[in-house]
């Protein structure tokens, strides 16, 4: 990854649960981020299981396999690559909408992905996307 002076990535394409530190362990702040993501997924799964609609928002993947790849971000791993998220999406038949936030008045492009419950996907896709 390109060093732009910002924080170092928590994950990469080979380490979806976190980039090991020098001792080979996952840093505490990455474990905390994983716990936040996993608990969020559990909440969404409970809602979906009881018939509620779910929409999860996060930036698109930017790694070398992504249609939205960015030079210098070849090893990028997004929330969408996180194994518990992949499993949740499969289990509940979640569907994807991708859109640029500038179409909604944002000052930058910020290509964003939404993971939607099947019952709301058509409306979300017609309203915001697709790219």
Task: Go through the PLM ranges and name each one.
Residues 1-131:
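Conserved active-site and SAM-binding loop architecture
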